[in-house]
């Protein structure tokens, strides 16, 4: 009788739980929830079902529910779109179809439509969403969604960049990832959030370069200061590098940082980078009318 493990007699070995199957797990009450209205529910969780976000999904730290738009289609063929009013190319998702899907999602969560004409997605917006109960995401297709249903449901439009995709599914996954990673316990080390790009701990600037072993590679060395053990010097170096990179690569952020020397959000119209200094600006405004007591 062979002592070989049973797996040796199998033709294939596969994981017991696949990313898509994670969505079949019972949802955890009170956990952050993403409802996704989409024509392609099989696209989720996608890469969100892997690595840290996938493990967090399996652990119930966040929930994911897809709402197939086709289920609410009209007629025998379950049509979800029609020709644009006023003429033009393409098709537009019908208001009545989208309304039915959003009603199925419920009205307890903010609704966001992933659209290139939306406000830029920022770290501050992702942080605000992570602090809330969740979000309902609309994944657009064709020429978009009938404006009337967006107005009726007070839908916020968010863009992930100045370019156009074939649909909103990838954009929705970007927003989910940017948000879920900020939920406590999702990342293995929450301290890693403190000094990354756009974070408050990094003054809203870009993150400094990172290095690891080996100390020498292809004639290139790790900066000596990072191996010195002098934590104050390392902090100064990283702060200096963050400023240098921001100035070179994101002049919009740098102008904002110079203007406030606190937070790049002062220059929101130029950068669209963050609105996390709003409270600071409002505080200064509230006190601007007070009499000068130093005179």
What are the functions of these language-model segments?
Residues 1-102, 227-255, 274:
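N-terminal nucleotide/polyanion-binding subdomain common to many enzyme families
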Residues 145, 149-196, 200:
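Structured adenosyl-cofactor binding patch, chiefly the S-adenosyl-L-methionine
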Residues 198, 202-261:
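Long, charged alpha-helical interface segments
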Residues 249, 262-271:
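Oxyanion-binding "anion nests"
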Residues 278-295:
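Long, low-complexity, intrinsically disordered segments
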